[in-house]
């Protein structure tokens, strides 16, 4: 059975000896007099030395990541949805994974890529079995796939982006999605899992917006500037459609190099039929060359992500 022994957010924490009622954690945390101090919080976890301790990180902050090495070195397992640990510079990344391997401490981060899809586990299993990754093609953004799969030329691209924002299909500032940065970070994680030593700046990124959109002073201004991209995007859509192809935002990893960009795919491609916020990963390996392994499913959602 799972026993909750500590919990914190950016403001308050509970880190005593007593177990916390899981159905009351929210109210208990809100009334806690303890101000969050991750140094104290992680120190208490190590000091308590409970059997089968697990540190769970569901933030997007770099602060918890600073304590990963110490936790792993003290046999505290880590389960994290936070991509920052696996996208920091290669030296720190290597140190972190060495800490986990040295003590054989579990370090799980499946949801870093593909929400609840079993991407990381499958990749690790293939490599551990002696397989060798030749190429990865992946649609890794539910937001990007929604925009590109739903666009049919009937309404401007800027209106579709606005609809995605209003319905929480995108980040509050859609530029966080359209910049391609999040996809690049997921791409970086996959490349490193394959054994390639690369840094985030090494990845070639094509944003799904103009430089003027990125430079807009706020979200309102961004949407005004985005209207100027409606016609160029429509022309690109029509050009692909005339060849029987569809546009997809794809990460490609091959020969130690990585790129994320808009790609045209034909009906024979695994990404052609993707709809909504689906993610899809195609793995071409030594054992799966003629018919690449394809992993496909929801790329977003509370239930599937938490299950991952």
Language-model segments: residues:
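General beta-strand structural signal in soluble alpha/beta enzymes
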Residues: 54-57, 78-81, 107-111, 135-138, ...
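Rossmann-like NAD(P)H-binding beta-loop-alpha module
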Residues: 101-104, 108-170, 177-182, 188-189
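Conserved active-site and cofactor/substrate-binding residues in soluble primary-metabolism enzymes
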Residues: 50, 91, 114, 118, ...
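Catalytic, metal-anchored helix/loop core of enzyme active sites in primary metabolism
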Residues: 135-137, 145-148, 163, 169, ...
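Substrate-binding/catalytic subdomain of NAD(P)-dependent oxidoreductase enzymes
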Residues: 150-151, 159-273
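Short acidic, glycine/serine/threonine-rich loops at helix termini
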Residues: 16-22, 90-93, 118-124, 148-152, ...
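N-terminal glycine-/serine-/threonine-rich beta1-alpha1-beta2 phosphate-ribose binding loop
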Residues: 1-73
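Rossmann-fold NAD(P)-binding glycine/threonine-rich loop
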Residues: 61-73, 83-111, 115-126
């Amino acid at each position: 059975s799972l026993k909750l022994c500590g919990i914190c957010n950016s403001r308050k924490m509970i880190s005593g000896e007593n177990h916390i009622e899981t159905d009351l954690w929210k109210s208990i945390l809100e009334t806690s007099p303890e101000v969050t101090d991750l140094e104290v919080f992680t120190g208490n976890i190590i000091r308590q030395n409970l059997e089968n301790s697990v540190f769970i990180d569901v933030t997007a902050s770099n602060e918890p990541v600073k304590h990963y090495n110490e936790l792993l070195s003290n046999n505290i397992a880590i389960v994290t949805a936070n991509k920052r640990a696996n996208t920091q510079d290669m030296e720190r990344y290597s140190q972190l994974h060495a800490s986990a391997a040295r003590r054989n401490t579990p370090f799980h981060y499946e949801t870093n890529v593909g929400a609840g899809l079993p991407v990381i586990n499958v990749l690790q299993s293939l490599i551990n079995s002696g397989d060798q990754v030749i190429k990865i093609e992946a649609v890794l953004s539910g937001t990007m796939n929604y925009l590109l799969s739903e666009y049919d030329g009937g309404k401007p691209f800027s209106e579709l982006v606005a609809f995605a924002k209003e319905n929480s299909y995108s980040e509050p500032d859609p530029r966080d999605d359209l910049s391609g940065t999040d996809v690049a970070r997921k791409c970086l994680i996959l490349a490193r899992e394959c054994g390639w030593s690369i840094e985030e700046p090494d990845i070639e990124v094509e944003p799904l917006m103009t430089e003027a959109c990125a430079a807009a002073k706020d979200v309102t201004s961004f949407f005004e500037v985005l209207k100027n991209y409606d016609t160029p995007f429509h022309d690109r859509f029509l050009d692909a459609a005339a060849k029987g192809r569809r546009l997809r935002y794809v990460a490609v990893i091959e020969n130690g190099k990585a790129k994320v960009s808009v790609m045209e795919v034909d009906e024979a491609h695994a990404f052609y039929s993707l709809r909504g916020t689906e993610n899809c990963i195609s793995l071409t390996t030594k054992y799966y060359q003629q018919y690449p392994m394809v992993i496909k499913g929801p790329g977003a959602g509370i239930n599937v992500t938490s299950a991952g």
